[in-house]
Amino acid sequence: MRRSRVGNASLLRRIGLGVSTQTESLPLAVLDFVGIEYGENAAASVAGAVGIARAVEAAGYRRYWVSEHHNMTSLACSAPELLIAHVGVQTSSIRVGAAGIMLPNHAPLKVAEMFRTLLAMYPGRIDLALGRAPGTDPLTAHVLRRGKVVDPGAEFPGQVGELLAWLGDGFGEGHPYSQLVAAPVIDEQPELFMLGSSQYGPKFAALNGMNAAFAHHMSPDLAFEALRDYRASFEPRSPGDEPYSAMSVLAFASEDEQAVLDFEAGWTLTIANLRRNIREPLRPEQVRELAGSEQFRSRRTDDGKMVTGEPKFVAERLLEMKEQAQADEIVVVTPSVSRDRREASYVALADAWRRAA
């Protein structure tokens, strides 16, 4: 007997599976890279991630997501499924998930087993966003894939199809995997999103009736058109299914102008370091030096790549961007700044969002 279909938000909403039960949650999420601050260890970073998740849950955010990155001494997010489990037990209502799981790095069966286990632990609260990028450098990707040469463009659709089959779509009669199951066997599925920072992800999501999540923080020039096209070209997997999208945006909200400058300088340094293959945590004095330089201050422009400033301004601008992209949710990305300042920014933004919406 064919297993139930999965992968679209509206079907899951109709049957009450895989969606938040928070009727008053905001259409806001947090994407956390679980950064390791200078001078601290990974244990402190993971504990800090729990603190952030609990703070944004209390502030009314709908989701808390962690990323998958490898070979980064400045990040503690190489095993997002474990972070989800750790955060899940110390929160009560916010949805927790990965944004994403880089599917070419993993066997689809193993991903299905991990997320079914998470759903058994935290029913109705687990999200799974899928990506096709490696989340790391080429050599690390080679090791993760045990030397297998992967062509994501050619192989990714098949990997997604296999994952959906393990999660509930089922394999066709006579398929060699049709007698196997992804254990534990449960009646619930994670809420699925397809990640993208190019046209590929939203197009794939539209053609396959999936939720879409676009990384404005990586490709700001493509985001709005890509998500509008996704909504216009959405093909439902089942009658009545509707498009559902989220857009991640670099944002920092504070009344403190120096804190805003530090965030902008920190992100500028992070990008510069990545281009030079420097993966260590930022030194606070580096950030202060850049933020205090006249050259940096004079070059600050409102180029649309990030939204920073007083909470009222940030909330109003994000609402405008949400409408412009025809997105259902905004995913806030706030790296390269101290955890205390991140938490304060998230809380201030939520308060300002309620007043502005």
Predicted regions and their residues:
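A conserved active-site cap/scaffold subdomain adjacent to cofactor or substrate pockets
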Residues: 202, 206-218
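Active-site mouth loops of central-metabolism enzymes
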Residues: 32-47, 101-108, 186-196, 302-310
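An alpha-helical appendage that flanks or caps ligand/catalytic pockets
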Residues: 12-22, 149-181, 222-327, 354-357
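Flexible, glycine-rich active-site loops centered on histidine and acidic residues
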Residues: 23-42, 104-171, 212
